[in-house]
Amino acid sequence: MSELERSRYATLYGPTVGDRIRLADTDLFIEVTDDLSRGPGGTATGDEAVFGGGKVIRESMGQARATRAQGAPDLVITGAVVLDHWGVVKADVGIRDGRISALGKAGNPDTMDGVHPDLVIGPGTEIIAGNGKILTAGAVDTHVHFICPQQVPEALGTGVTTLIGGGTGPAEGTKATTVTASPWNLHRMMSAMDGWPVNVALLGKGNTVSEDAMWEQLRAGAAGFKLHEDWGTTPAAIDACLRVADASGVQVALHSDTLNEAGFVEDTLAAIAGRAIHAYHTEGAGGGHAPDIITVASFANILPSSTNPTRPHTVNTLDEHLDMLMVCHHLNPSVPEDLAFAESRIRPSTIAAEDILHDLGAISMIGSDSQAMGRVGEVVTRTWQTAHVMKRRRGALPGDTVADNNRARRYVAKYTICPAVAHGLDAEIGSVEAGKLADLVLYEPAFFGVRPSLVLKGGFIAWAAMGDANASIPTPQPVLPRPMFGAAPGPAAASSLMFVAPAALQDGLDERLGLAKPMVATADVRRRGKADLPENTATPDIRVDPDTFTVRIDGEAVEAAPAAELPMAQRYFLF
C-alpha cells in the first residue's frame, strides 16, 4: 500500500492525529488527539470525504443515494479540527434541521468503510470544506448593553452568536446597566431582535424589593435579572432578587456596590447566602466593591466572569479605563467625588491577579460589556490574548507538553459552554455536540480568534469573509466580513432562539407576542455552581490588602507585569 508523507496528507485532507496547529500568531498550539473523519478507531483511511472536481464526494462514489427523508444531513463540514471544552479532534460534522446531527466520518456506506449512520451524504447534502480549518462553537457574550443595533454585525463578524444582557438603546440607563425593564420595553426589544441572526436572552431589573415587579418582568420575557449598583444593589435588593430567582429558576447577574455605601463585600456575600449568582467583571474595574470584589471568585456558589477591556493586563489598560468609566457612569471629572469614585475602581494589582485567576480556571467566563466599558467585537480575541500572555509568563499547564490542549480547552470554554451553563442555555448552545443548535465558527488557523472564515447560525451561513461581489470568483480583495443569506430576517429568525424564563411560556407569551424567532425557556440554574463550569472550577483562597491593594492567591502575592506587546493585534488590524 502506498503511503503519503504527513505534510502531504495535511495539505490534501487537513491535519490528523499528532499534528499540531498554531493558533493565529500566538505561542499557543493545539494537537489533534483523534481523527473521527477516518471512521471508528481512525482506521478507514484513503477515502476521506473531500469535495471538488475529480474528488470523492460525487455520485455513487462519496455521495450515496440517500434522500433527506432517509436521514441524509442538510450540510456536512468535512475534515475540520474541532476545538471545544471536551477536546481537540478532527471530524466531519453533520447538520440537519439546523442542529448538529453527528461528528464522525461522512460519505457513502456503499463504497466507504466506517461511515457514521447520521453522516450519509445524499443528493440533498451541501458541503463546506473544513479541511485544514478549526471549528468552534459560536461565542456567547454574557454581558451586552443593547445600546445600538450595529453591535450585532460587529459581534457576528467575530463569531459571537448569542447575546445575553439588556437595554433599550442609547438611554442613560442602558449605557450604564444591562437592564431591559418593564414588559413594554421587553416586548419592543424582543421584536427588534427578531430579525437578527443571534440568540438573545434579555435581563430584567432586579434592583427592587418588590417581588411582583420582578415576576411581571419574567412573565413578559426576561430570561433573568441584573442587579446593578447604579440602580442600588443593596443587601435587601440582592436577597429579594435571589428569592424570586430561586422560585423561578433563572440566573441573576451582579454588579455590586463600588462605594461600599450599603455594605462591604462581606455584606453582599451574606445577602447572597450561598445561592448561585453570576458575578460580572469580578476583578472590579468594571464595578463592584472596592478594592476586594475579586475575592468572590473563591466561593463555589459564585459564577465569576470578566469583561474584555482588562483582558489581558497591558501597559495601556489603566490609562484607557479612567476615561471609559467617566463616560459610562455619567461622571464629571471636575467633581472630586466623581473622580475618586473612578480612581477607586482602577487597580493594577487586581487586574494583574485577574490574569492569573483566569489561567487557574478560577474566573470562569469572559464577556464584552459592550459600549459600556467593553468591546462587543473583541470577546474572542481578548480571551486568546490572555491565554498567550499566561503561557509566556507561567509556562505550560499541568498535562500540557508539546501542545496546549488543556489551556485551549479552558479558554474556549470561557466564552462558549461556561456562560451557556451559567444562564441555563447549555441544552441548546455552547458546544459542538450532537443535538445542539449548529451555531458554529470556522477559522483558517492563521486567523483563529481574529477573523472567521464562516459563521453558521442554526446551520445556515450568516456571516463570512467575502471578496468583491462583482468579481468573477469569491476571493478578490477587499475580503471583508459580510452578511450572508442567513442574515436575512426570515432565515435569521428561523435559525435563532429567544431565551425567556419558564414563567413567560407558562403565561402564553409566545402566542401573544407572535415573534418569528422561537421562544425557548431557560433551564433551572439555581443549583448550579462553579463546579458545573467545564475546565473553570477552581476556588483558590484570594485576599486583598485594603491599604496596598496587594492580591494574594493561595498565599502568594501577585506582581503586576503588564504586557507591552500582544498577538492578534496590529498584524491583523489597520485601526
From Swiss-Prot:
Catalytic activity as recorded in UniProt: urea + 2 H2O + H(+) = hydrogencarbonate + 2 NH4(+)
Subcellular location: Cytoplasm
Keyword annotations from UniProtKB, A to Z: Cytoplasm, Hydrolase, Metal-binding, Nickel
Cofactor note: Binds 2 nickel ions per subunit.
GO molecular function terms noted in the UniProt entry: nickel cation binding; urease activity
Cofactor: Ni cation
UniProt keyword Cytoplasm, yes or no: yes
Main location: cytoplasm
Binding-site residues for substrate, renumbered to this chain: H228
Signal peptide extent: none
Keyword Cytoplasm: yes
Binding site for Ni(2+) 1: H143, H145, K226, D369
Pathway: Nitrogen metabolism; urea degradation; CO(2) and NH(3) from urea (urease route): step 1/1
Class of the enzyme per the UniProt entry, highest EC level: hydrolase
GO cellular component: cytoplasm
Pfam families documented for this protein: Amidohydro_1, Urease_alpha
Swiss-Prot/TrEMBL GO biological process terms: urea catabolic process
PROSITE patterns: UREASE_1, UREASE_2, UREASE_3
Residue numbers binding Ni(2+) 2: K226, H255, H281
Location of the active site: H329 (proton donor)
EC number: 3.5.1.5
Superkingdom, taxonomy of origin: Bacteria
Entry-linked NCBIfam families: PRK13206.1 (NF009685), PRK13207.1 (NF009686), urease_alph (TIGR01792)
Name by which UniProt lists this protein: Urease subunit alpha
Native source species: Parafrankia sp. (strain EAN1pec)
Gene for this chain: ureC
